[in-house]
């Protein structure tokens, strides 16, 4: 249990592993993320916090490989469970052709991923459902049972009134790093950017960019169809600004 908790704390970027006296390992809240969430929403009650945790999980390729590949590299928006497993398997083999994949572990990982985002009707009867399906309110995955056929898994675009513009801006700025600008194309196609992480299509991305531009966080140059995006001086300390409104 302790190892499992430690794993998820690191996979969600909430803690960094340190070594103390005699090399003993311990967990410390991450400076720019874990501490901010602990100070502002330690029980993860805010929907924006859950979107942030989802982003950190999906962008952690080392500790959450299945999540990373599913959201970033599988481009299909609907698939059977079998096709999902085969897609993840092939992507892993593309990275390391010699890697020995356990079919059981792969199936368990894919089941865990779907379960994280989609609550079955029977699960909803359990008041502790959020512990089973912590990201079910994000609206990123749904599942449909068709009689006589395999169940279908869908990647879905979250409702605009759920995914806050400042959460979107945080992910944009986190991906921007030291660069001075980005493009709509980058936001749509780049690994770990808002298009892949939140299943956002071009229209929805433009919706958020227009709002962030109108509120002064971004400057957009649409000359010659380049759609280049520049952050303004307001686009700093995004998490502090987000949580100050709660």
Predicted regions and their residues:
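Donor-sugar nucleotide-binding helix/loop cap in glycosyltransferases
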Residues: 1-246
């Amino acid at each position: 249990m302790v190892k499992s908790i430690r794993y998820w704390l690191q996979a969600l970027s909430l803690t960094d592993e340190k070594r103390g006296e005699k090399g003993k390992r311990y967990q410390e809240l991450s400076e720019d993320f874990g501490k901010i969430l602990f100070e502002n929403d330690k029980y993860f009650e805010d929907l924006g916090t859950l979107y942030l945790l989802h982003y950190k999980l999906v962008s952690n390729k080392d500790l959450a490989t299945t999540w990373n590949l599913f959201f970033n590299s599988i481009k299909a928006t609907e698939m059977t469970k079998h096709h999902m497993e085969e897609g993840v398997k092939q992507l892993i083999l593309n990275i390391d052709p010699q890697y020995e994949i356990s079919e059981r572990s792969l199936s368990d990982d894919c089941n865990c991923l779907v379960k994280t985002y989609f609550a079955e009707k029977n699960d909803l009867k359990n008041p502790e459902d959020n512990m089973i399906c912590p990201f079910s309110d994000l609206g990123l995955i749904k599942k449909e049972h068709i009689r006589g056929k395999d169940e279908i898994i869908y990647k879905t675009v979250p409702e605009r009134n759920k995914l806050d513009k400042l959460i979107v801006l945080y992910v944009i700025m986190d991906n921007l790093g030291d660069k001075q600008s980005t493009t709509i194309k980058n936001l749509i196609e780049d690994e770990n950017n808002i298009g892949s992480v939140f299943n956002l299509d071009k229209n929805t991305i433009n919706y958020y960019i227009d709002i962030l531009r109108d509120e002064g966080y971004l400057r957009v140059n649409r000359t010659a169809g380049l759609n280049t995006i520049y952050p303004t001086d307001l686009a700093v300390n995004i998490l502090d600004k987000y949580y100050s409104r709660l």
